[in-house]
Swiss-Prot record:
SUPFAM superfamilies: Metallo-dependent phosphatases. Residues 47-250 are annotated as: Catalytic. This is Serine/threonine-protein phosphatase CPPED1. A divalent metal cation 2 binds at residues 90, 127, 247. A divalent metal cation 1 binds at residues 53, 90. Protein phosphatase that dephosphorylates AKT family kinase specifically at 'Ser-473', blocking cell cycle progression and promoting cell apoptosis. May play an inhibitory role in glucose uptake by adipocytes. The modification Phosphoserine is found at residues 2, 294. It comes from Pongo abelii (Sumatran orangutan). The lineage of its organism: Eukaryota, Metazoa, Chordata, Craniata, Vertebrata. Its EC number is 3.1.3.16.
């Protein structure tokens, strides 16, 4: 079954937008809401990491299935329901053309089909989803499987932009696709400026930076200095408040001028000391408040009262 046939939860992005949120109904502020952010379920990485062969390993992913099922069950129990559930890339571990890619994809679809149908999915492309050096073919495969690789949508007067960050990391095999996203992004940021939206929020897989705009190039976990600065300045000029990313498999982040960079750890394999988890993000008229929960915490206790008070505030 393809994502399109799965229906319900798979409101796949098409035409650079998400039909789960019609713009004409969602362009005005209606009051506080929240969403759930996850990153890097990356079916197969835990086995590959444990064997020390991240390039060719990953022939088992039962642990990731259980963790993602736990994440979905925790989300489904939440009341009130989140506006959406966003996955910030690296949905699976097997790169394009590698063994087990089809099987990992089908298993993830099966788990995601159990998300409450009232909670749309927002899917972000990661480097493992489209390759470290994406091509027109790998991007097309992602789009056919999961929906557009970049798009925008409105929720209650807030503009959300989903970006394909691999175009900023290595566009050498698809320069025209990168150019198209650049042009589209400029148009979207112009809309954000002109419309004076309540907030503008960006989702992308690779962080601009892990702690500081001036940190050294990591050559893997952050974008290059010149790229990150150019993007961050663009975002700030348009009034973007926060960029959410995954990729690092640890919690991290920092602030540049008035732009927050939030790096959220993984549902799947942890590369640091954080627990497997999800981030609760509350959007109020004045601010964006977020907190990382372990899957166990969210499953057993739900969202804490101080955040619930913000969500219910009129």
């Amino acid at each position: 079954m393809s994502a399109a046939e799965a229906g319900g939860v798979f409101h796949r992005a098409r035409g650079r937008t998400l039909d789960a949120f019609p713009a004409e109904k969602e362009s005005e502020w209606k009051g506080p809401f929240y969403f759930i952010l996850g990153a890097d379920p990356q079916f197969g990485l835990m086995k590959a990491w444990s064997t020390g062969d991240c390039d060719n390993g990953g022939d088992e992913w039962e642990q990731e299935i259980r963790l993602t099922e736990q994440a979905v069950q925790a989300i489904n129990k939440l009341n009130p329901k989140p506006k959406f559930f966003v996955l910030c890339g690296d949905l699976i571990h097997a790169m394009p053309g590698k063994p087990w890619r089809t099987e990992q994809t089908e298993d993830l679809k099966r788990v995601l089909r159990t998300v409450d149908r009232a909670i749309p999915l927002v899917l972000v492309s990661g480097n493992h989803d489209i390759g470290n050096a994406p091509t027109a073919e790998t991007v097309d495969e992602f789009c056919r499987t999961w929906g557009d690789d970049y798009f925008s949508f409105w929720v209650g007067g807030v503009l959300f932009l989903v970006l394909n960050s691999q175009f900023y990391e290595n566009p050498s095999k698809c320069p025209s696709l990168k150019q198209a996203q650049d042009q589209w992004l400029d148009e979207q940021l112009s809309i954000a400026r002109q419309r004076h939206c309540q907030h503008a929020i960006i989702f992308q897989h690779i962080p601009l930076f892990l702690e500081s705009i001036d940190e050294d190039d990591d050559y893997y976990f952050n974008l290059s200095k010149s790229t990150r600065k150019k993007l961050a300045d663009k975002f700030i000029h348009a009034g973007v408040k926060v960029v959410f990313s995954g990729h690092y498999h640890r919690n991290a982040g920092g602030t540049y001028q008035n732009l927050d960079m939030v790096v959220s750890s993984a549902i799947g394999c942890q590369l640091g000391r954080d627990p497997h988890g999800l981030r609760v993000v509350v959007v109020t008229a004045e601010k964006i408040v977020h907190r990382y929960y372990s899957l166990d915490e969210l499953s057993e206790k739900g969202i804490e009262d101080d955040l619930m008070d913000l969500i219910k505030k009129k």
